[in-house]
Amino acid sequence: MKRAHSCCFLSVGVLVGSFLAGASPAAADVTPSPAPGGPPFGLPTATGAPLPVTPPSVPAVCQQVQARLSTSNGLFPGPVEAAPPDTTRIQAALDACAGSGKAVDLVATGASNAFLSGPLFVKGDEYLLVDAGATLYASRNAGDYQKPGDVAKCGYIASQDNGCYALINMDGSNSGVIGTRAPNGNLGTIDGRGWATIINGEYDESWWALGEQAKSGGKQNNPMLINGYGVNDVTIYQVDLTDSPFFHILIQNGTGLTVWGIEIDTPAVGARNTDGIDPKNETDVVIAHDMVQDGDDCVAFTSDPGTPTENATVEDVHCYGTHGISIGSPTAGGLSNILVRDVSLDGYDSFGNQSTDDNGIRIKSEPGHGGVVHLVTYEQVCMTGVEHPLFFTPHYSSSTSTQYIPIFQDIVVDGLRATGSPSPTSSLFEGYSASEPLQIELAHVILDNTTQSSQNAYVQARVDDSNIIPAGMDVTVTSAGEVPGHVPHCVIPPFGPPPPSGPPGPPAQ
């Protein structure tokens, strides 16, 4: 039984002025002081990527593939598990439909509603379509996912995590993974079975247990659900992604990514490194109307040297028990023009599990993997039960490298409310140095616990109508004047499939 998220935030009047760090919410004035080296800086705001007026559409069908299996518990007889019977016939349909602009449609027939497959490759100008009522299950045979060449062994712990193909590999541009919606709201489902025991793995344990074991050293070689590299205009729409062994979605080094109206349903505890939606080295990204619970980041933007991530919008996305909406830790290629608005974060998943790294909005990096992160705007953000509502650090690891220094500039938080904060709770504001401070504006930010980390340092902050003021070594605070906007009045929706128009975001009142 999933826990209902019916919590509500009470509307409060606008509080004038700002509050001392760690103090109870009571009006106080901010005495403007000049920023080092000149007058107070002005922070521009991100525009992100433009949202389409209408959601993506379900494509026409090129070929239909009918289910031949059924299961009540997500498992199949031994011979079926050892040699998944649907890989070849689904891939044959995908190969035949490549370039058509149409879909290979997986459909239930009578009592048969399941497919069992190893890695699939979606070519250019085609889509994999999973009908509501049908479930595509991932093989648990590690050998099915093994990549060729001098790489790690899939299903093993190794020094690298490069041994496994994903279940679904985006192998061409203008492609996607799409589901249909049943009258009761249920979506077509792709189930990674991360909880199931691996066949032909290093140990007699599940994918998730292998990930937990890798904490003590090495990296887990588990398959992702959806992965793409160097492909443009990828659409992931109206599909339920469940229990991934590793990342749910990683799309990298392309232009044009839309993730719209999906549900990611994986527990917050015991499912290590099961990130939700990860765009890496991507340009023109839209992530909208999604419901996400998993064992790592809800959304995480990253970049490698020479390949920036830029022009992205995250809108009407709701996160449960995750590690937050994050940027980093790799930021070496730079990240810019990222807009996050009308989002909510609950520190607990629908099963009642508390996040294992309970963050709200987070920018993290470290020397050796850092770059310039600038023009990032958060608007109308709601949180409940979040341990670290605001988390900004260029020292995410203990690296002492003098190359690829993290720099965070033009970070704006305009409209944020956090309630139900656990104990202890703290926020972190940290820049790299006095010459490379964190530049941040906080407007209309109200937390029910304003405690800050003792690591706070090197910050230039502008503040208006907020009850948290960064404080610490080499921290300068100036008044932002009267910034247009307001503290959000919030209702966090219960976790479940997003409705056709997207889940209700925090209302702008």
PLM features: residue spans?
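Extracellular "leader-to-stem" segments immediately downstream of a signal peptide or signal-anchor
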Residues: 2-230, 237, 246, 258-262, ...
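Short glycine/acidic-rich loop motifs that flank beta-strands on beta-rich extracellular proteins
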Residues: 102, 116-117, 138-141, 193-196, ...
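Short strand-loop junctions, especially beta-strand C-caps/beta-turns
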Residues: 109, 302-304, 328-330, 364-366, ...
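Short, T/G/N/S-enriched strand-turn elements that build extracellular solenoid repeat scaffolds
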Residues: 91-97, 114-124, 139, 176-179, ...
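Extracellular beta-rich repeat passengers
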Residues: 351-509
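Right-handed parallel beta-helix
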Residues: 132-133, 173-188, 232-242, 255-268, ...
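Residue-level marker of regulatory loop/turn positions in helix-turn-helix DNA-binding domains and
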Residues: 82, 218-220, 228, 251, ...
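Short edge beta-strand segments in beta-sheet-rich domains
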Residues: 15, 272-274, 437
